[in-house]
């Protein structure tokens, strides 16, 4: 029973001395007493290599490299193990989650958090922490009973103690945790003869838990000798750089005093690891107060990058230089990081440079398609077949892998499902998924082609296959009663899915193609899944459980699964975190992410028990718990020290100025401290360095081509570019080995997001030999030619969703008002409140079920919206009644369609126009309402257009002039052309072109006293006042509002009179008859010009900016045109907005059938 301590700073030869000592013993007596080297799990492989790769050793049976848990198993092999079943991490958390749910009603502080998955994970960590530091439920209960404390803290500890106690009772005599097995190991030590003959070496640790100190105490007591290696100068100052390992030394001294033995200390002061003065000076001076600056010889570098991605690209380039120019091997290089965001960057960047690497971290399995399939399957059952988990399940492609183009079929199915609002048991309705229904996908139904029919039949078949599997799974699970039944049902369902065979086939294909890591992932996925099922049966067995609880517990288990990947080769870059990675004696170590906030890292308490509660508990209960945040914060300098002293040749520190989320970052204060130790240690700004040394960017062929592309693009933009890039281009271009993909990059250089003008033949192929279009299509072209090209040329359509769009609401109002108008023959004056309500209900019952597959009856929200629609209609009818009472114009025609060849007698004829290319223009559409008034054998007509949006319920004559608003003039033109079909007199003249805003008015009051019922009704009526343009003819004016008189402004039409009876400029929107005719004729010319441009093949991305607004704000095609408001302002078209449109139109000479100038 002897105890040795090798003490010294980093690189002083402590571990080398230990290895030399062990090797000498192995050479002297290969079959001698056992030698045990205890090291952290991350270091065991590296230390085993140190023995295996030694040519002087021919192998030995006496030396083993173990961590504490493996050592316990070695002892159990000799003296016998425990009889209880060992609980895995997943099994432990599943059991604790179930206990929490059962005990939820007894919890005082955590009752509301009990249902959350994360809470059981935190609670498991806390219980494991208690076990590591030998804190039992009895400790907690005794402490709570004897001490006065804050109510919150008391309730918290009582809750934890309750779960802890229940957990201990559940596992008693049946299960054992990893921490408990170590306690059992301590109890078995006296029985081990093998241990009594062993020489024990402990290396690579900087701190221990209470249970580990007890193990060390047992080893010291029962082993022949124990040697512990610590990185410390022996200073016990709590503010020393070596506080953490010195704390370990203090504990070892206490153990030695308890066992009444002395520690044979051996101090190591001579530095051996470092090959140069830079690293020696860095190690010796890092923690001194009085700095001794020396000249830097170039073995320490500090790199500053703009972004994290740029930072890792530069590290990759420098690794290539290390391999090519310095003759290093990949295994001589290590990268250490702390910010988890870097792990993703390593995976995405290093393969681009063909750098082999191994990240020493475990990755969660939760994002693997198989795990996502299983978790989505569980959620489908839990959520009663909601659409989101169903679509996630389908998109994993695990259950649909047997289908060709399965991803495309699933996309089509998703479109259909979202359009029809499929959820719940509607998935099972075969009639809903009839192939014929797919012809109605989108806004327009069409007849299916044979290819479309075959495709949609595959979609339906795929859906049926997946539904069959889900139903099988649901049936199997619903028949289960115990956990064992559920686990069996789950496994049998996976067999029914043929998942094992599918995974094994995929694994074999990956292995055959050399993708061994992905193949290993599949093995671990399946084995992990089986392990969770085994754990469930082990822990719960025949215990009854609801399906809901089982699926919750099962999901908890799946969350714990992690990939443990074995390195695929020995010669690879080692990557790990600064806190855990065990890399020693590397020629070059890169420390990335050296930013303030990462190194040092602000440490906050993450456990259920706060730092203050820990300190109070330790003081009052005389126990030790895991270190508090302030203690961990003090050790940050030691973490940096250990990380930077792993190298023996070069150390490169790097940091970025921008984080992964775009936040600004500062340099680590440790780098400022390191920089102060040396003269001439400057920070290298990477962009500036490459600007001065462009050849430094040319380290890897593929990446050089990408950087070359950026350089040539800058050159084309007249920026100054180094001649070396032009030389590089010529070399790559002329090399058959290097020029692969160069043509693609060069074509990208000239890409400027410009559309191409279509040829005459292609225009006719896209648009036809005649244009049959609505007014809105031409208005869309005026907004942006590309928008028209995308919608009517390429026929791009947005996915239709099962939700009410703005245009759906407009269609509803139009249909309802048409229905009611026809029922009363347009005589709104006859309506009373009872009749309004009756007609509204009738109309809604008739029309709403036809909207979006009965969307408005699909949920409580939409049923509420239906009632709101009814209220708006009732208010609208009241306003129409009021307007009809005071107008001589009578509504006569409703929702009147027009086209070149009418299909019925009720439809109107639209005159065909012709483009400059001779292409016919056939305009079609529908006029919401036509009001007429006849006097002296002359008919006057009003065009009334219902708008549900306030923004579109305004007639802007400037827009009319420039062809941006063509609807009203077109409608008036059509009506004037069809006097006979409308039953009008031989003489027909325009009355008004008016918009009616269908809405629910909001009236503002300053106070309750302002509310007056009569005034309220008047204000409501004013909100429905028609807007637009009125013929200034006195007959029209008198007929629009019979109340008009001097000093009166109408509240139903945009007309008002001055004191002298003349039209008020402020209250009137009027134009003379000739002007209206000119607008109509000019509108026709806009049609011809627009249609001619369309057939000319114009497809420019050229939105029209009007009143500082762009149509891009509401355009569906921005993801196609990629127009950017910040850099594409040169693309915008504008018009002269300062013109007076009436004066401008009057100055145009137009000859037409109306007898204009």
UniProtKB/Swiss-Prot annotation:
<keyword id="KW-0269">Exonuclease</keyword>
<keyword id="KW-0234">DNA repair</keyword>
<dbReference type="GO" id="GO:0004386">
    <property type="term" value="F:helicase activity"/>
</dbReference>
<keyword id="KW-0411">Iron-sulfur</keyword>
<keyword id="KW-0227">DNA damage</keyword>
<dbReference type="GO" id="GO:0051539">
    <property type="term" value="F:4 iron, 4 sulfur cluster binding"/>
</dbReference>
<dbReference type="GO" id="GO:0005524">
    <property type="term" value="F:ATP binding"/>
</dbReference>
<comment type="subunit">
    <text>Heterodimer of AddA and AddB.</text>
</comment>
<dbReference type="Pfam" id="PF13361">
    <property type="entry name" value="UvrD_C"/>
</dbReference>
<feature type="binding site">
    <location>
        <position position="784"/>
    </location>
    <ligand>
        <name>[4Fe-4S] cluster</name>
    </ligand>
</feature>
<feature type="binding site">
    <location>
        <position position="1121"/>
    </location>
    <ligand>
        <name>[4Fe-4S] cluster</name>
    </ligand>
</feature>
<dbReference type="InterPro" id="IPR049035">
    <property type="entry name" value="ADDB_N"/>
</dbReference>
<dbReference type="InterPro" id="IPR014017">
    <property type="entry name" value="DNA_helicase_UvrD-like_C"/>
</dbReference>
<dbReference type="InterPro" id="IPR027417">
    <property type="entry name" value="P-loop_NTPase"/>
</dbReference>
<feature type="binding site">
    <location>
        <position position="1112"/>
    </location>
    <ligand>
        <name>[4Fe-4S] cluster</name>
    </ligand>
</feature>
<dbReference type="GO" id="GO:0003690">
    <property type="term" value="F:double-stranded DNA binding"/>
</dbReference>
<dbReference type="GO" id="GO:0000724">
    <property type="term" value="P:double-strand break repair via homologous recombination"/>
</dbReference>
<keyword id="KW-0479">Metal-binding</keyword>
<keyword id="KW-0067">ATP-binding</keyword>
<keyword id="KW-0378">Hydrolase</keyword>
<keyword id="KW-0547">Nucleotide-binding</keyword>
<feature type="binding site">
    <location>
        <begin position="8"/>
        <end position="15"/>
    </location>
    <ligand>
        <name>ATP</name>
    </ligand>
</feature>
<dbReference type="Pfam" id="PF21445">
    <property type="entry name" value="ADDB_N"/>
</dbReference>
<dbReference type="InterPro" id="IPR011604">
    <property type="entry name" value="PDDEXK-like_dom_sf"/>
</dbReference>
<keyword id="KW-0540">Nuclease</keyword>
<keyword id="KW-0347">Helicase</keyword>
<dbReference type="GO" id="GO:0008409">
    <property type="term" value="F:5'-3' exonuclease activity"/>
</dbReference>
<dbReference type="InterPro" id="IPR014140">
    <property type="entry name" value="DNA_helicase_suAddB"/>
</dbReference>
<dbReference type="Pfam" id="PF12705">
    <property type="entry name" value="PDDEXK_1"/>
</dbReference>
<dbReference type="GO" id="GO:0046872">
    <property type="term" value="F:metal ion binding"/>
</dbReference>
<protein>
    <recommendedName>
        <fullName>ATP-dependent helicase/deoxyribonuclease subunit B</fullName>
        <ecNumber>3.1.-.-</ecNumber>
    </recommendedName>
</protein>
<keyword id="KW-0004">4Fe-4S</keyword>
<feature type="domain" description="UvrD-like helicase ATP-binding">
    <location>
        <begin position="1"/>
        <end position="275"/>
    </location>
</feature>
<feature type="binding site">
    <location>
        <position position="1115"/>
    </location>
    <ligand>
        <name>[4Fe-4S] cluster</name>
    </ligand>
</feature>
<keyword id="KW-0408">Iron</keyword>
<keyword id="KW-0238">DNA-binding</keyword>
<feature type="domain" description="UvrD-like helicase C-terminal">
    <location>
        <begin position="269"/>
        <end position="583"/>
    </location>
</feature>
<dbReference type="InterPro" id="IPR038726">
    <property type="entry name" value="PDDEXK_AddAB-type"/>
</dbReference>
<comment type="similarity">
    <text>Belongs to the helicase family. AddB/RexB type 1 subfamily.</text>
</comment>
<comment type="function">
    <text>The heterodimer acts as both an ATP-dependent DNA helicase and an ATP-dependent, dual-direction single-stranded exonuclease. Recognizes the chi site generating a DNA molecule suitable for the initiation of homologous recombination. The AddB subunit has 5' -&gt; 3' nuclease activity but not helicase activity.</text>
</comment>
């Amino acid at each position: 029973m002897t105890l040795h301590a090798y003490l010294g700073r980093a690189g002083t030869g402590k571990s080398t001395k230990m290895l030399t000592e062990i090797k000498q013993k192995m050479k002297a007596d290969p079959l001698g007493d056992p030698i045990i080297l205890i090291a952290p799990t991350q270091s065991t492989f590296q230390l085993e290599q140190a023995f295996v790769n030694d040519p002087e050793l021919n192998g030995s049976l006496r030396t083993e490299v173990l961590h504490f848990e493996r050592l316990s198993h070695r002892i159990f092999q000799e003296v016998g193990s425990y009889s209880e079943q060992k609980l895995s991490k997943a099994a432990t958390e599943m059991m604790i989650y179930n206990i929490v749910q059962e005990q939820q009603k007894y919890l005082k502080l955590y009752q509301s958090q009990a249902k959350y998955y994360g809470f059981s994970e935190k609670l498991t960590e806390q219980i494991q922490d208690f076990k590591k530091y030998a804190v039992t439920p009895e400790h907690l209960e005794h402490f709570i009973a004897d001490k006065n404390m804050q109510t919150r803290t008391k309730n918290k500890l009582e809750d934890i103690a309750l779960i802890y106690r229940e957990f201990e009772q559940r596992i008693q005599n049946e299960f054992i945790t990893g921490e408990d097995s170590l306690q059992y190991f301590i109890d078995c030590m006296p029985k081990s003869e093998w241990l009594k003959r062993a020489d024990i070496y402990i290396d690579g640790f900087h701190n221990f838990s209470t249970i580990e100190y007890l193990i060390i105490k047992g080893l010291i007591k029962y082993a022949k000798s124990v040697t512990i290696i610590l990185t410390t100068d022996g200073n016990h100052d709590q503010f020393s750089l070596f506080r953490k390992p010195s704390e370990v030394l203090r504990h070892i001294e206490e153990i030695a005093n308890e066992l009444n033995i002395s520690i044979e200390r051996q101090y190591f002061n001579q530095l051996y690891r470092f090959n140069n003065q830079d690293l020696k000076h860095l190690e010796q001076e890092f923690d001194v107060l009085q700095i001794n600056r020396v000249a830097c010889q170039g073995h320490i570098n500090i790199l500053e990058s703009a972004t994290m991605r740029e930072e890792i690209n530069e590290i990759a380039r420098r690794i290539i230089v290390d391999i090519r120019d310095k003759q290093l091997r990949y295994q001589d290089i290590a990268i250490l990081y702390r910010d988890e965001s870097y792990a993703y960057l390593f995976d995405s960047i290093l393969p681009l440079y063909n750098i082999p690497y191994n990240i020493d971290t475990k990755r969660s399995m939760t994002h693997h398609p198989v795990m996502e399939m299983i978790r989505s399957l569980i959620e489908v059952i839990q959520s009663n077949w909601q659409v989101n988990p169903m679509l996630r399940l389908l998109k994993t492609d695990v259950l649909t892998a047997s289908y060709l183009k399965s991803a495309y079929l699933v996309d089509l199915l998703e479109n259909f499902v979202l359009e029809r609002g499929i959820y719940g048991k509607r998935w099972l309705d075969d009639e809903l998924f009839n192939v014929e229904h797919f012809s109605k996908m989108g806004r327009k139904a069409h007849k299916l082609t044979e290819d479309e029919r075959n495709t949609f039949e595959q979609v339906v078949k795929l859906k049926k296959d997946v539904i069959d599997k889900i139903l099988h799974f649901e049936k199997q699970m619903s028949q289960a009663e115990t956990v064992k039944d559920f686990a069996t049902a789950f496994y049998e369902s996976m067999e029914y899915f043929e998942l094992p065979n599918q995974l094994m086939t995929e694994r074999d294909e990956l292995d055959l193609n050399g993708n061994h890591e992905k193949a290993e992932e599949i093995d671990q996925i399946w084995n992990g899944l089986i392990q969770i099922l085994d754990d469930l049966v082990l822990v719960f067995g025949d215990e009854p459980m609801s399906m809901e609880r089982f699926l919750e517990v099962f999901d908890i288990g799946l969350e714990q699964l992690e990939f443990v990947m074995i390195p695929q080769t020995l010669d690879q870059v080692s990557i790990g975190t600064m806190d855990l990675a065990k890399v020693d004696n590397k020629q070059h170590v890169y420390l990335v992410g050296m930013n303030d906030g990462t190194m040092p890292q602000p440490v906050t308490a993450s456990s259920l028990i706060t730092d203050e509660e820990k300190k109070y508990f330790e003081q009052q209960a005389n126990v030790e718990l895991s270190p508090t945040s302030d203690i961990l914060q003090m050790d940050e300098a030691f973490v940096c020290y250990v990380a930077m002293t792993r190298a023996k040749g070069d150390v490169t520190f790097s940091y970025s100025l921008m984080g992964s989320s775009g936040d600004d970052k500062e340099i680590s204060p440790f780098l400022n401290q390191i920089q102060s130790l040396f003269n001439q240690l400057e920070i290298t700004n990477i962009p500036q360095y490459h600007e001065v040394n462009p050849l430094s960017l040319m380290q890897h062929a593929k990446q050089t081509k990408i950087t070359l592309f950026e350089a040539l693009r800058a050159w084309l933009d007249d920026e100054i570019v180094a001649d070396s890039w032009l030389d590089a281009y010529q070399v790559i271009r002329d090399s058959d080995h290097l020029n692969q993909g160069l043509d693609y990059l060069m074509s990208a250089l000239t890409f400027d997001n410009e559309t191409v003008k279509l040829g005459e033949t292609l225009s006719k192929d896209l648009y036809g030999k005649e244009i049959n279009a609505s007014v809105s299509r031409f208005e869309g072209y005026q907004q942006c030619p590309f928008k028209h090209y995308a919608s009517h040329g390429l026929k791009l359509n947005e996915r239709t969703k099962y939700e009410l769009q703005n245009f759906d609401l407009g269609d509803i109002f139009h249909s309802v008002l048409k229905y009611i108008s026809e029922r009363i023959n347009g005589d709104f004056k006859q309506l009373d409140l009872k009749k309004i309500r009756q007609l509204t209900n009738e109309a809604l019952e008739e029309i709403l079920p036809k909207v979006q597959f009965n969307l408005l009856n699909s949920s409580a929200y939409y049923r509420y919206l239906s009632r709101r629609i009814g209220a708006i209609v009732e208010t609208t009818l009241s306003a129409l009644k009021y307007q009809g009472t005071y107008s001589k114009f009578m509504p006569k025609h409703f929702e009147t369609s027009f086209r070149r060849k009418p299909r019925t007698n009720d439809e109107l004829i639209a005159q065909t126009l012709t483009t400059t290319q001779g292409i016919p223009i056939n305009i079609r559409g529908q006029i919401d309402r036509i009001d007429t008034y006849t006097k002296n054998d002359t008919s006057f007509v009003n065009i009334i257009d219902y708008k549900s949006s306030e923004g579109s319920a305004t007639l802007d004559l400037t827009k009319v002039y420039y062809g941006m608003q063509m609807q009203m003039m077109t409608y008036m033109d059509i009506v004037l052309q069809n006097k006979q079909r409308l039953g009008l007199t031989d003489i027909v003249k325009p009355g008004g072109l008016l918009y009616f805003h269908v809405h629910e008015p909001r009236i503002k009051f300053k106070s309750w006293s302002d509310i007056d019922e009569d005034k309220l009704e008047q204000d409501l009526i004013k909100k429905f006042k028609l807007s637009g343009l009125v013929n200034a003819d006195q007959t029209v004016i008198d007929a629009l509002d019979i109340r008009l008189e001097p000093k009166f402004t109408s509240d139903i039409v945009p007309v008002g009179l001055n004191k002298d009876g003349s039209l008020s400029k402020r209250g009137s929107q009027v134009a003379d008859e000739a002007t209206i005719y000119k607008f109509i004729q000019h509108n026709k010319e806009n049609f011809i010009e627009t249609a001619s441009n369309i057939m000319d093949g114009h497809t420019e991305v050229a939105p029209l900016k009007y009143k500082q607004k762009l149509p891009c704000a509401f355009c569906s095609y921005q993801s196609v045109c990629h127009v950017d408001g910040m850099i594409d302002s040169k693309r915008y078209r504008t018009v002269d907005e300062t013109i007076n449109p009436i004066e401008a139109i009057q100055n145009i000479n137009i000859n037409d059938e109306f007898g204009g100038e």
